[in-house]
From Swiss-Prot:
Keywords: Developmental protein, DNA-binding, Homeobox, Nucleus. This is Homeobox protein ceh-33. Belongs to the SIX/Sine oculis homeobox family. CDD domains: homeodomain. Gene3D superfamilies: Homeodomain-like (1.10.10.60). One of its GO terms (molecular function) is RNA polymerase II cis-regulatory region sequence-specific DNA binding. Its main location: nucleus. GO terms for biological process: regulation of DNA-templated transcription; regulation of transcription by RNA polymerase II. Residues 133-192 bind DNA. Pfam families: Homeodomain, SIX1_SD.
């Protein structure tokens, strides 16, 4: 049954919704996913049916509405109290993480950088209700990275079939491949500089390793810790091109701009 949001009128949702099967309810929820007002009306009408209260599409729709209304406490409650099928995991994972990012940004009064987001993910790991337990690796093997970069240079939007082929070639999961392409496109849209040959791609964990390695080198370079503050950005950049650290305020930067941890 093919449905779209233009097929519905708010008055439809006040009628007898018992005529909708679970499959039809799922289709309607998907069709209304871009119209929060109509989706909300439909969900609360369907919830009058007791058997629909644990319907995964209805629960997912409730989570969607909670996320987009910034009702993060309700979002977390829905996610943590219901086990979702794997087909729903990806959007629920994104809402979970983005909600925690948003809360952290509101408290800090600034946007989170890559390192800040990494720390939030460590602090608020995905619940097992929306995660199959498989570790997500941000440190892919060099061969895998080369294959992904090469493909991205030719096509930044691979099809589902192409993603499966890439997953087999790189020994990654389809989800990891999808996330890699999504993150790379986001970096490009944000204007993060990349070499023309698409060969530069430093992951978040690699950034952290580089930061720790830089800190270790700097601390070993001086007998007097106070000398660290006088160590120039140019000297740090010479050791690790593209990065510098200011130990007075623990700011990390790349190029001509920097962001605080």
């Amino acid at each position: 049954m093919q449905l779209n949001s233009s097929s519905f009128h708010p008055h439809h949702f006040t009628c007898d919704t018992t005529r909708y099967s679970e499959e039809q309810v799922a289709c309607i929820c998907e069709a209304l996913s871009n119209d929060a007002r109509k989706l909300s009306q439909f969900v609360w009408t369907v919830l009058e049916r007791d058997e629909m209260r644990n319907n995964q599409y209805i629960l997912k729709a409730q989570a969607f509405l909670a996320f987009h209304s910034n009702n993060f406490k309700e979002l977390y409650r829905i996610i943590e109290s219901h086990h979702f099928a794997s087909e729903h995991h990806l959007p629920l994972q994104e809402w979970w993480l983005n909600a925690h990012y948003h809360e952290a940004e509101k408290i800090r009064g600034r946007q989170l950088g890559a390192v800040g987001k990494y720390r939030i993910r460590r602090k608020y790991p995905l619940p097992r209700t929306i995660w199959d337990g498989e570790e997500t690796s941000y440190c892919f093997r060099d061969k895998s990275r080369v294959l992904l970069r090469d493909w991205y240079c030719r096509n930044s939007y691979p099809s589902p079939r192409e993603k499966r082929e890439l997953a087999e070639k790189t020994h990654l999961t389809v989800t990891q491949v999808s996330n890699w392409f999504k993150n790379r496109r986001q970096r490009d849209r944000a204007g993060v500089p990349e070499p023309k040959d698409c060969l530069k791609d430093i992951s978040e964990e690699e950034d952290l390793k580089l930061i720790r390695k830089t800190a270790s080198k700097l601390s070993n370079s001086f007998h007097n810790p106070s000398d660290l503050s006088s160590y120039s950005a140019a000297a740090a950049a010479a050791t690790f091109p593209g990065f510098y650290m200011n130990y007075n305020d623990m700011m990390i930067g790349a190029g001509t701009s920097y962001q605080s941890l």
